[in-house]
Amino acid sequence: MPELSHRRRMAVLAICCMSLLIVSLDNTVLNVALPDLQKEFDASVSGLQWTIDAYTLVIASLLMLSGSTADRVGRRRVFRIGLIVFTVGSALCSIAPNLGLLVVFRMVQAVGGSMLNPVAMSIITNTFTDPRERARAIGVWGGVVGLSMAAGPLIGGVLVDTVGWRSIFWLNLPIGVAALILLSLFVPESRAPHGRRPDPVGQILVIVLLAALTFGIIEAPDAGLTSPLVLGCAVLAVLAVALLVPYELRRPEPLIDPRFFRSLPFSGATVIAVCGFAALGGFLFLSTLYLQNVRHYSALHAGLWMLPMAAVTFVSAPLSGRLVGSRGTRVPLLIAGLGMTASGVLFAAFDGQTHTVTLVVAFVLFGLGFGFVNAPITNTAVSGMPRAQAGVAAAVASTSRQTGSALGVALLGAILASGITPQRYEATFTDAARPAWWVLTGCGAAVLVLGLVSSGRRAKESAVRAAARLEEAGHVPVAAKR
């Protein structure tokens, strides 16, 4: 990619952030609409989980393929296709006649979404070559997540209360069209010098692993933990892992390059992403159902309740990016872990009569923690890798996020479903949700501990060694690797 002027780099950053906005906004808006979907389609808790997880599961399964494909055939080309598919999928979601087709159309959306965020991050990485400038750009990128969290519940609440839940998908149409036009005008084409070839076997094994794991968790409350269905999913997931790891180790150009994980910071960032986004996915799912179904708030009122959390995330994400650029990843990760853990403890101790101040503090603490977690994950994932493999490295980080989000909704939703009584929904919700909040607390504690472990001197030395090996391997011609 040629060196761009400062103004052109800012334009590229803005366009990439637009893609993140529509993808992030889509999920936050939909969470507010879940109770309305539940009423219109007479949906169970597992049905609501699938409207979220069908999307995140497909994205998680295809992100690495999208990243490597973009590095090989052109990042702008793949980005354009993703915008088109996502926009069309949004239009289809808005006319879905039943829950089953809504889930299918959400999967169409996800196919497009898988081509947006990791490819956009790869474009940003190759556009901003100075480490400090890149860290600030990633901080802005993380701030867009906060913006979507702030705007999503409010916009979603207004639309659901006034027009209906279908209108939430209309939001993506003008943003998607505008991003397509600006993409053609400002973003140059770029690709890796030696893009990796497709890995269909690895791709299939990843899909089987994530699908079996998520399906088994979501369906466990209804089918039973010892049912043939759930046990079959568990066996299938274990088998997929057992086949995937040795197969990828033998591949000269694997879908998931095991050498990435020789870097302790990269491995730590991957697990932190799973834990942090599992907490976020479960948090939004449980909070929305609690506010609307137990406290009987309207969609707009529930959106206003989430505003303190979203506002703090919006403010803290750019600050996290600046801290990463000036002081490294340890401080932001410690703040993130402490905020999420403290919030989880407060939520695990609450009941339906908790004072308003307690709940607001819990929302603010979670927003603070999540706001600080995104920038160090992204910066660690892409900064220690050769620029030629930026797409794949960013895709691994993004896959970890989406996997965490899917597992968070699946696991915390399954815990809720196993303890709740439909005939006494309000009376049993708080006790049924309490174990789920403790799981969220554990996710925050994991972020805290891993933040310490993955940012020390020994961890940094492992990152240097891993990057050197990757650079050395990157200079070996593909033909010589066979």
Residue ranges and their predicted role:
Residues 173-192, 207-219, 236-251, 447-457:
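C-terminal membrane-cytosol helix-exit motif in multi-pass small-molecule transporters
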Residues 188-204, 251-256, 459-470:
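Flexible cytoplasmic inter-helical loops of multi-pass small-molecule transporters
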Residues 46-50, 100-108, 164-171, 197-199, ...:
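Interfacial loop-to-helix junctions that mark the boundaries of transmembrane helices
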Residues 129-131, 189-194, 214-231:
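Alpha-helical transmembrane bundle and helix-membrane interface signal
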Residues 1, 465-482:
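Short, intrinsically disordered terminal tails adjacent to the first/last structured region
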Residues 9-25, 30-32, 45, 215, ...:
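12-transmembrane solute porter fold
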Residues 70-71, 75-77, 133-135, 192-198, ...:
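Interfacial helix-loop-helix linkers and transmembrane-helix boundary segments
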Residues 1-185, 318-320, 327, 333-341, ...:
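Transmembrane-helix bundle of Major Facilitator Superfamily
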